[in-house]
Amino acid sequence: MSIIVVKKEEQAQGSFNNGAILENKPIGFPQDNGVQKAYSNLFYWAHAYSTEGSTIGLHPHKGFEIVSYVLKGAIKHYDTKYEKWLGVESGGFQVIKSGSGISHSEELEKDSEIFQIWFDPNLNESLNKEASYADYNSEVLPIEINENRSIKTIVGENSPVKLDTEGIRIQEINIKKNFLLELDSNYSHSIYVIQGKVILNDKQIEKDDFAIVKKEMEIQINGEIDSKLFIISSPTTPSYTTYINS
């Protein structure tokens, strides 16, 4: 049984364009100074936000599966394959399968906030695939509602989003009452608090804190009404050698 908590102040920090875009990183790059590095097949996770709006210029990616979830506002994406700007609004999701190589530019509009997460889909295979891009509006992502919580499934059962990375499930949970969440004990469950305060078993976390739950079959979630969690479940030990373990 294991619950690791990474407070916001323990996470790596980043910025672009003289602070026009700011980041806290629950999972930092290997060279970053935050306490949590890559594990499972999660390589990187940033929470990025901008009050004024800003664009990150064209830059390359290879191999990794890079997803962005819009928490607030909107983002735009341009890449060297499709050669046009495409937009995603609040609640939407975009997937870049960078494969053998693609360059892209990204814009956060004014007062926007996103997660950007890099998954390791098995680079031995992905580097030999053609790059691709897809995006999904919030309306196509299924939501299950009961008296205790609503669960939006971004990746997983009944979602149109398909990732190459093994065993990934992504959900956004809005808490109405305290409830028990069933878990797969063979998976690592990575939890970011989007808003509010919650207690996971006996661990208290609040907005922008991060927790990793391992070797648990269930977890008690007690939270303020309308607290919101973003949860990624991933195999604790993937069936392939990841970049970080190569």
Regions found by a protein language model. Name each.
Residues 1-246:
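Jelly-roll (double-stranded beta-helix
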